[in-house]
Design a protein with these regions (language model features):
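Short, well-ordered alpha-helical microsegments
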Residues: 69-71, 135, 227
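Phosphate/pyrophosphate-binding loops at sites that engage ATP/ADP/AMP, CoA/4′-phosphopantetheine
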Residues: 43-59, 80, 203-215
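Short, aromatic/basic amphipathic alpha-helical patches
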Residues: 72-79, 229-232
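Short glycine-aspartate micro-motif
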Residues: 2-6, 61, 125-129, 218
Length: 257
């Protein structure tokens, strides 16, 4: 069994995988000021709550888009499990062909998503990861990473409206009864949810047109389960895509005995 951790700007996903299957998955808030001990305590809590046996863990891997947390979490894993995790970055074997202007700029989370997508779903492929930012990655028929799009995440858009307007309230991410809102709360809900779904549909259609094909579309990340069902395109939901990708990368890079 391996420990897999993905550090995002808003949340950290902690999970264990065995034989390519996700055993458990937990989500905690990213805190750049947390100490090694605090993150080690979070790991212990995740294992305890899922009754997972730490003695069964024989490896660990993490990806991160928050450099301030990467080393802290690495040390926390070592403190709790007495293992040094692999860190997704330069030197890690991915098998991914990256066709963008500067491959070094591609975020580790997008690399991990792509590795998992290629392994589990038909190509060509569009991967939508709905986190702090919503990222759209495009994989061609040969599994090459062609590029993508970045747009504000649903929560970021919501926070910007609430903080920069005098009278628009915070709302829950739940569907209004009607698309056409008749009060501020329902108008916001409709705009945020259906607006983001419409944006994704538009990007999917444009990508398909540019590639002159119909891509498999996979969605993952915090609000994907809310937005994807509202899209008119067929979208596969996979909440464990990142953990699956980390598991694959661990197998590609684990130390040989």
């Amino acid at each position: 069994m391996i420990l897999a951790i993905d550090i995002g700007n808003t949340n950290i996903v902690i999970g264990c995988c065995a034989d390519g299957q996700v055993i458990f998955r937990e989500r905690v808030s990213t805190n750049p000021t947390a100490t090694v001990l605090e993150y080690a305590a979070m790991l212990k809590m995740a294992f305890d709550m899922n009754r997972a046996d730490i003695t069964a863990v024989d490896g660990a891997i993490l990806s991160s888009v928050v450099p301030a947390v990467t080393l802290t979490m690495r040390d926390a894993v070592h403190k709790y499990l007495h293992l040094t995790p692999l860190v997704v970055g330069p030197g890690i074997k991915t098998g991914l062909r990256i066709h963008i202007d500067n491959p070094a700029q591609l975020g580790s989370d997008l690399v991990v998503d792509a590795v998992a997508g290629i392994h589990h779903y038909p190509l060509p492929q569009i991967i939508i990861d709905m986190g702090t930012a919503t990222t759209v990655s495009v994989l061609d028929a040969e599994g090459g990473y062609r590029g993508g799009m970045i747009l504000p995440g649903v929560a970021v858009s919501h926070d910007a409206l609430a903080s920069r307007t005098a009278q628009l309230p915070k709302v829950a991410f739940e569907l209004p009864k009607h698309t056409i809102g008749t009060n501020s709360v329902d108008c916001l809900k409709s705009g945020l949810l259906y607006g983001n779904a419409g944006a994704l549909d538009g990007l999917i259609d444009r990508n398909n047109a540019e590639l002159n094909t119909s891509c498999t579309v996979v969605a993952t990340g915090g609000l994907s389960s809310v937005i994807a069902p509202l899209c008119r395109n067929k979208i596969i939901l996979d909440d464990d895509l990142l953990l699956k990708g980390l598991s694959i990368l661990f197998e590609k890079n684990k130390p040989k005995n």
